[in-house]
C-alpha cells in the first residue's frame, strides 16, 4: 500500500503525547522508543484471532497516520497488557492505545461494542449486569446473590448516571438519557 503525503499528519505523534501526558505522564511519549521488533504483535492474544497488529498501530502513530482513529484495529485490543509486559523497549503500548482511543472518541469514532457496553453501564451500573446464571454462581461460592453495587443499591445508579453526564461521557458515546438508547455519533473529519 502506497500512502500519499496528504495522508500523514506530522502533528499526530505530538497530539498523542499531549493528550496522554496528564494521565500517563512520561509513558505517553514511550511509543517514540519503539524500534518495530514485533514482540508486541507476537504476544497479543487478540491479534491471534483478529486483524489487530499492535506493531502496525504504533508504527502508524509514529508516522503520523491518523487514519487509525477511524479504523477497527484500535478497538480490538482487550487491554490485557501482554504487549506492555513483553516490550524490550518498555513502550507502554496499552496506555498508548488508550490515549489514541480517547482521541478517536473525541472525534466520534467509537466501536459499536464499546458503545453498547457503555450503555449497559448507564442502564445498570455494570458492564456485565447480573443475570440468573451469575446469581447462581455467586451463591455457589458463598456470596450473596446480589453484589453490593447498583444492583443492590439502585439509588446509586442515578449517581453513576449523573457522573457519566457530568463528564460528558454520555455525549461522547451517544447515550440519550430520555430514551435510554444510543444515538448516532457526530464524526469530526480531519481537516485536509
Swiss-Prot record:
EC numbers on record: 1.8.98.5, 1.8.98.6
UniProt keyword terms in alphabetical order: 4Fe-4S, Iron, Iron-sulfur, Metal-binding, Methanogenesis, Oxidoreductase
Keyword field contains ATP-binding: no
Cofactor note: Binds 2 [4Fe-4S] cluster.
GO BP, one annotated term: methanogenesis
One cellular-component annotation, GO: plasma membrane
Pathway(s) where this gene product acts: Cofactor metabolism; coenzyme M-coenzyme B heterodisulfide reduction; coenzyme B and coenzyme M from coenzyme M-coenzyme B heterodisulfide: step 1/1
Residues reported in the UniProt entry to bind [4Fe-4S] cluster 1: 34, 37, 40, 87
Cofactor(s) annotated in UniProt: [4Fe-4S] cluster
Domain 4Fe-4S ferredoxin-type: 25-54
Pfam families documented for this protein: Fer4_8
UniProt GO molecular function: 4 iron, 4 sulfur cluster binding; CoB--CoM heterodisulfide reductase activity; metal ion binding
Binding site residues for [4Fe-4S] cluster 2: 44, 77, 80, 83
Substrates-to-products reaction catalysed: coenzyme B + coenzyme M + 2 reduced [2Fe-2S]-[ferredoxin] + 2 H(+) = coenzyme M-coenzyme B heterodisulfide + 2 H2 + 2 oxidized [2Fe-2S]-[ferredoxin]; coenzyme B + coenzyme M + 2 reduced [2Fe-2S]-[ferredoxin] + 2 CO2 = coenzyme M-coenzyme B heterodisulfide + 2 formate + 2 oxidized [2Fe-2S]-[ferredoxin]
Subunit structure: The heterodisulfide reductase is composed of three subunits; HdrA, HdrB and HdrC. B1 and B2 subunits are interchangeable, as are the C1 and C2 subunits. The heterodisulfide reductase forms a supercomplex with formylmethanofuran dehydrogenase (Fwd), F(420)-non-reducing hydrogenase (Vhu) and formate dehydrogenase (Fdh).
Protein's job: Part of a complex that catalyzes the reversible reduction of CoM-S-S-CoB to the thiol-coenzymes H-S-CoM (coenzyme M) and H-S-CoB (coenzyme B).
NCBIfam families cross-referenced by the UniProt entry: CoB_CoM_SS_C
PANTHER family attached to this UniProt entry: IRON-SULFUR-BINDING OXIDOREDUCTASE FADF-RELATED, IRON-SULFUR-BINDING OXIDOREDUCTASE FADF-RELATED-RELATED
Family: Belongs to the HdrC family.
Name the UniProt record assigns to this protein: H(2)/formate:CoB-CoM heterodisulfide,ferredoxin reductase subunit C1
Organism (species): Methanococcus maripaludis (strain DSM 14266 / JCM 13030 / NBRC 101832 / S2 / LL)
Phylogenetic placement of the source organism: Archaea, Methanobacteriati, Methanobacteriota, Methanomada group, Methanococci
Gene encoding the protein: hdrC1
Amino acid at each position: 500500500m502506497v500512502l500519499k503525503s496528504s495522508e500523514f499528519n506530522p502533528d499526530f505523534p505530538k497530539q498523542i503525547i499531549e493528550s496522554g501526558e496528564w494521565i500517563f505522564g512520561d509513558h505517553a511519549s514511550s511509543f517514540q522508543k519503539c524500534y518495530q521488533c514485533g514482540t508486541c504483535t507476537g504476544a497479543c492474544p487478540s491479534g491471534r484471532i483478529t486483524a489487530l497488529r499492535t506493531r502496525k498501530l504504533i508504527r502508524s502513530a509514529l508516522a503520523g497516520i491518523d487514519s487509525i482513529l477511524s479504523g477497527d484495529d484500535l478497538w480490538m485490543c482487550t487491554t490485557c497488557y501482554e504487549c506492555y509486559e513483553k516490550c524490550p523497549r518498555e513502550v507502554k503500548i496499552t496506555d498508548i492505545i488508550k490515549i489514541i482511543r480517547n482521541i478517536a472518541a473525541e472525534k466520534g469514532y467509537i466501536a459499536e461494542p464499546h458503545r453498547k457496553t457503555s450503555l449497559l453501564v448507564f442502564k445498570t451500573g455494570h458492564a456485565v449486569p447480573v443475570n440468573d446464571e451469575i446469581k447462581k454462581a455467586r451463591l455457589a461460592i458463598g456470596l450473596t446473590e446480589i453484589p453490593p453495587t447498583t444492583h443492590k443499591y439502585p439509588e446509586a445508579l442515578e449517581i453513576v448516571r449523573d457522573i457519566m453526564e457530568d463528564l460528558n461521557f454520555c455525549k461522547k458515546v451517544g447515550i440519550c438519557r430520555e430514551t435510554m438508547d444510543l444515538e448516532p455519533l457526530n464524526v469530526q473529519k480531519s481537516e485536509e
